[in-house]
Amino acid sequence: MTDLSDIRREYTKGGLRRSELPEDPMALFERWMEQAKAAELTDPTAMCVATVDELGQPYQRIVLLKRFDEQGFVFFTNLGSRKATQLKHNAHISLLFPWHPLERQVAVTGIAEPLSTAEVLKYFVTRPKDSQIAAWVSAQSSKLSARQVLEAKFMEMKQKFSAGEVPLPSFWGGYLVRPASIEFWQGGEHRLHDRFIYEKTAAGWDIERLAP
């Protein structure tokens, strides 16, 4: 076994206090996202998306957040992918934004709802053409005999759609994650980290401090 126990550091970038928190977690998320972008973090919109299969086995993967508002968080994917198949059977989902250089994490739990075709199309047409073509090429999560198969399919579809617009594939869509809870974590000195969790209620949001 490889021992990694001596890899550690102190967290020194500041704390988080209840008096600083807005009543709406999405306002704090927006503030933190803007700070992550301003700090020029690599892929500040990257989030770890966790879903569960029918046997209760969790799966995780990195996906890019494409939009957020007071309703929740939006991402897009192939509807034949493992994550989409699992969400069809169990819509419970969790998201994690790991902003390590800022010593911050945001963890979300909630329910994933499929987006309408109109909402998906509105985003799809903004993608670069090669990305639109790639959506047609990859049967996400299926097994491939070789990378050359994928590349050949891409060139075939690129030729097919060379003259005009790329249509939205019927098997490509997106989800709105409606949050049930959002936890904000800020690293603290001596491992006394600051954690606050917002939990959705009928009246709005409850806010509680959690032990680190």
Swiss-Prot record:
Subunit: Homodimer.
Keyword Flavoprotein recorded: yes
Record field: catalytic activity: pyridoxamine 5'-phosphate + O2 + H2O = pyridoxal 5'-phosphate + H2O2 + NH4(+); pyridoxine 5'-phosphate + O2 = pyridoxal 5'-phosphate + H2O2
PROSITE patterns recorded: PYRIDOX_OXIDASE
Keywords: Flavoprotein, FMN, Oxidoreductase, Pyridoxine biosynthesis
Cofactor: FMN
Enzyme class at the top of the EC tree: oxidoreductase
Positions bound to substrate: R8, R9, E10, Y11, K66, Y123, R127, S131, R191, L192, H193
Originating species: Shewanella amazonensis (strain ATCC BAA-1098 / SB2B)
Family, similarity comment: Belongs to the pyridoxamine 5'-phosphate oxidase family.
Residues holding FMN: 61-66, 76-77, 82-83, 105, 140-141, 185, 195
Matches recorded under PANTHER family: PYRIDOXINE-5'-PHOSPHATE OXIDASE, PYRIDOXINE-5-PHOSPHATE OXIDASE
Pathway(s) of this molecule: Cofactor metabolism; pyridoxal 5'-phosphate salvage; pyridoxal 5'-phosphate from pyridoxamine 5'-phosphate: step 1/1; Cofactor metabolism; pyridoxal 5'-phosphate salvage; pyridoxal 5'-phosphate from pyridoxine 5'-phosphate: step 1/1
Biological process, per Gene Ontology: pyridoxine biosynthetic process
Comment on bound cofactor: Binds 1 FMN per subunit.
Domain of life assignment: Bacteria
Record protein name field: Pyridoxine/pyridoxamine 5'-phosphate oxidase
Molecular function (Gene Ontology), one example: FMN binding
InterPro entries: Pyridox_Oxase (IPR000659), Pyridox_Oxase_CS (IPR019740), Pyridox_Oxase_N (IPR011576), Pyridoxamine_oxidase_dimer_C (IPR019576), Split_barrel_FMN-bd (IPR012349)
Summary of the function given for this chain in its UniProt record: Catalyzes the oxidation of either pyridoxine 5'-phosphate (PNP) or pyridoxamine 5'-phosphate (PMP) into pyridoxal 5'-phosphate (PLP).
EC number: 1.4.3.5
